[in-house]
C-alpha cells in the first residue's frame, strides 16, 4: 500500500473546527480516489462513496431539494446497508464534475456542518458556469500530485529514520558516504524512468518489470489523450493534443527547452496554439516555467506569459512519449547530450512543481547569463542550475555576485555535496526532494 503525504493534510482537516467540505484536486490517475478510500478506512466507521461516472443514477439524490436531510435520506435509500452517522461516516463524492448539482450542494453540507464530506474529480469537466451556485467560501482544497521521490522511497522500503539520516548530510553540507550516495542515485534514476503515477510505481514495487511499467505509462498517456478528445471544445481538440504530444520533443530533443509552436506544426504560431496551452494548463495536463526578465523579488512581476517551458505534470507521461530504450539508458546511466540534460531538468522541475512552487527561468541575451530554474522560498529568490555533469555554473556564480539579496543558489549534479565560497551549494540530483 503506497503511503501518501496527502493523508497528513486530511488528518489535519478532520480535526479542524467548523471544517468545510474538502475538494481533492489533481490530474487523472494521481491516486486521489485510492488515497481517500484508505483514509476513510483508517479514520471512519463507514464510507458512503458515490462515483458519478460509475453510478450516474445516483445523481437523482441531488436532483431535488438540496437540504442535508433530503440528501442523507436519499443516500440511506440508495445504500440501506450503510450507517450514516455524523462524525463516524465519511461521504465521498467522486468524479463530481459529472454532477453539477452535487457541486452546488457542497455549500449546504458545509453550512450544516454535521457530516464530513470529501469530493474529488478531474478539473476537466467542471463547468463553473453551469453550477447554479459554486460553493465559494464553503470548501477547502487539497492539490494532489503524482508520487514524489520521498514517497517513492517509502514504497521501496526506505524508512523515515533512514531519510532523516540522509537529510542530516544536507543540513550539515557534508559529503554523503559513497555506499549511500550510489544507492540513492540508483533509486533516483529508477524513479525518473518510472515517474510518479501510482499504478506505475506500485507495479515496479511488485514486479521490477520495466516492460510492464512501459505498458502502464502508455495506457495512462492514452487516457490523457482521451480526456482531451472528450472534454476539449471542438475547436481545441486537435490543437491541444498536438501541443501535448510535442512536449517530449520540446524538452528532450533540442538544447533550447522553450516551448516553440513550430515544433507543434511546421509554421505554427502562438496566435493559433496559445489557447490550447491555456486549456492544457487548466486541465492539469501541463505546468509552466515562465521566463523572467529580472532576478529580483517578486519574480512574478517580471514573468512573461508568452515565453515559457511546458512540462508534463508527471514524468510517467513524459516517458510514455518516448521509446522504451530511454528508460533503459536512464537506469543504466548511459544517456548523453541533450537528452541527459533535458531529463534531469525535467526531473528537477517535476520535484519543485510537486512541492507547489511556481517555476521561472532566466535568460539575458545581452550578457548570455541564464538560470535553468528559479523559485522563491522564505521570501528570497533561489536560483537553481541543473548540470548533467559536474561542470561550472558561471551564470549562477555571476548572479550571486551581482545580487546581494540572493544569498545562495543550488547546483544539482550527478555527483555529491559541496559548498563554495561564492554561495553555490552543490547537491546530488536526488536531494531536490528534501530542500
PLM regions and their residue ranges:
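Conserved lysine of the Walker
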Residues: 32
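Pre-Walker A adenine-sensing motif
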Residues: 1-17
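Hydrophobic positions on the alpha1 helix immediately C-terminal to the Walker A/P-loop
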Residues: 35, 39
Amino acid at each position: 500500500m503506497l503511503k501518501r503525504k496527502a493523508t497528513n493534510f486530511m488528518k489535519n482537516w478532520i480535526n479542524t473546527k467548523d471544517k468545510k467540505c474538502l475538494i481533492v484536486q489533481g490530474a487523472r490517475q494521481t491516486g486521489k480516489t485510492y488515497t481517500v478510500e484508505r483514509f476513510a478506512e483508517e479514520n471512519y466507521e463507514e464510507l458512503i462513496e458515490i462515483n458519478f461516472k460509475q453510478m450516474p443514477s445516483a445523481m437523482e439524490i441531488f436532483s431535488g431539494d438540496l437540504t442535508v436531510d433530503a440528501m442523507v435520506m436519499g443516500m440511506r435509500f440508495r445504500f440501506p446497508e450503510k450507517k450514516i452517522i455524523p462524525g463516524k461516516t465519511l461521504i465521498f463524492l467522486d468524479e463530481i464534475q459529472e454532477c453539477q448539482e452535487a457541486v452546488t450542494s457542497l455549500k449546504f453540507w458545509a453550512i450544516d456542518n454535521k457530516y464530513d464530506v470529501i469530493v474529488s474529480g478531474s478539473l476537466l469537466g467542471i463547468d463553473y458556469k453551469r453550477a447554479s451556485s459554486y460553493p465559494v467560501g464553503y470548501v477547502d482544497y487539497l492539490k494532489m500530485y503524482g508520487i514524489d521521490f520521498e514517497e517513492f522511497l517509502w514504497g521501496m522500503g526506505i524508512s523515515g529514520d533512514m531519510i532523516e539520516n540522509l537529510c542530516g548530510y544536507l543540513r550539515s553540507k557534508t559529503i554523503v558516504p559513497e555506499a549511500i550516495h550510489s544507492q540513492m542515485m540508483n533509486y533516483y534514476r529508477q524513479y525518473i524512468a518510472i515517474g510518479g503515477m501510482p499504478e506505475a510505481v506500485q507495479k515496479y514495487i511488485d514486479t521490477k518489470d520495466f516492460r510492464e511499467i512501459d505498458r502502464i505509462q502508455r495506457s495512462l498517456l492514452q487516457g490523457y489523450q482521451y480526456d482531451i478528445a472528450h472534454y476539449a471544445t471542438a475547436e481545441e481538440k486537435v490543437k491541444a493534443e498536438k501541443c501535448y504530444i510535442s512536449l517530449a520533443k520540446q524538452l528532450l530533443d533540442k538544447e533550447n527547452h522553450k516551448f516553440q509552436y513550430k515544433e507543434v506544426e511546421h509554421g505554427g504560431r502562438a496566435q493559433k496554439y496559445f489557447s490550447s496551452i491555456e486549456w492544457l494548463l487548466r486541465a492539469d495536463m501541463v505546468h509552466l516555467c515562465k521566463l523572467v526578465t529580472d532576478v529580483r523579488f517578486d519574480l512574478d512581476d517580471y514573468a512573461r506569459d508568452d515565453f515559457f517551458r511546458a512540462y508534463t505534470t508527471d514524468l510517467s507521461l513524459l516517458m510514455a512519449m518516448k521509446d522504451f530504450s530511454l528508460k533503459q539508458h536512464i537506469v543504466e546511466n548511459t544517456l548523453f547530450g541533450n537528452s541527459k540534460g533535458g531529463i534531469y531538468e525535467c526531473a528537477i522541475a517535476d520535484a519543485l512543481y510537486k512541492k507547489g512552487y511556481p517555476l521561472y527561468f532566466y535568460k539575458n541575451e545581452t550578457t548570455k547569463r541564464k538560470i535553468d530554474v528559479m523559485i522563491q522560498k522564505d521570501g528570497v529568490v533561489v536560483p537553481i542550475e541543473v548540470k548533467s555533469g559536474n561542470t561550472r555554473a558561471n551564470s549562477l556564480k555571476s548572479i550571486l555576485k551581482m545580487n546581494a539579496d540572493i544569498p545562495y543558489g543550488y547546483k544539482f549534479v550527478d555527483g555529491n555535496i559541496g559548498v563554495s565560497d561564492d554561495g553555490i551549494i552543490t547537491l546530488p540530483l536526488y536531494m531536490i526532494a528534501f530542500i
